[in-house]
């Protein structure tokens, strides 16, 4: 039976960072201690209708190719005050920010960066919910692709 406690060679953690810098130099901040997160990549489909043969009544075919790539980030967490201020301001201003999604491998105390995606993103949703009882409120964020691409870079960010 496999050792499920050994996370070496397994994507074990996603780190979501936002460049909150106001000058030319980046100020990467961990979005929050997101305990439930996802990075979703999709690709649209492009179709072209072509006539398969010449002549009246000729059959028509639809050819499909890969279209533009898109992505979204979603997560839920209890927010630290600094992260809440950053996300609240981002939602109010509505601008694009650089987003970095780092894929880590290994145990939470010895994480090794496998690689990361980095590109412009737009904060589309920020909702905060207070559960019943004495539980801590949690925030849900939804970030979507901004202008440009989000290329993959192997290894740890510089």
Model-identified regions with their sequence ranges:
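Glycine- and charge-rich intrinsically disordered segments
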Residues: 1-2, 158
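Short, acidic/charged, Gly/Pro-enriched secondary-structure junctions
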Residues: 84-120
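Polar, enzyme-active/binding microenvironments
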Residues: 20-23, 107-112, 153-156
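Solvent-exposed edge beta-strands and adjacent loop segments
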Residues: 2-79, 120-137
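Residues within well-ordered beta-strands of beta-sheet-rich folds
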Residues: 74, 102, 142-144
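Acidic glycine-/aspartate-rich tracts in secreted/extracellular proteins
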Residues: 80-82, 148-149
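Mixed-charge, glycine-accented linear interaction segment located at domain edges/termini
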Residues: 118-158
């Amino acid at each position: 039976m496999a050792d499920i406690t050994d996370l070496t060679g397994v994507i074990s953690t996603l780190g979501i960072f936002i460049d909150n810098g106001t000058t030319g130099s980046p100020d990467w901040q961990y979005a929050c201690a997101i305990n439930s997160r996802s990075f979703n990549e999709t690709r649209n489909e492009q179709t072209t209708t072509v006539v398969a043969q010449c002549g009246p009544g000729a059959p028509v075919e639809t050819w499909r190719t890969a279209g533009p790539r898109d992505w979204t980030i979603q997560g839920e967490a209890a927010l630290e005050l600094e992260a809440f201020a950053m996300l609240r301001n981002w939602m109010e201003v509505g601008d694009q920010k650089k987003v970095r999604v780092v894929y880590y491998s290994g145990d939470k105390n010895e994480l090794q960066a496998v690689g990361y995606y980095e590109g412009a993103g737009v904060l589309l949703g920020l909702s905060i919910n207070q559960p019943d009882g004495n539980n801590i409120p949690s925030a849900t964020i939804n970030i979507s692709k901004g202008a440009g691409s989000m290329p993959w870079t192997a290894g740890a960010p510089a």
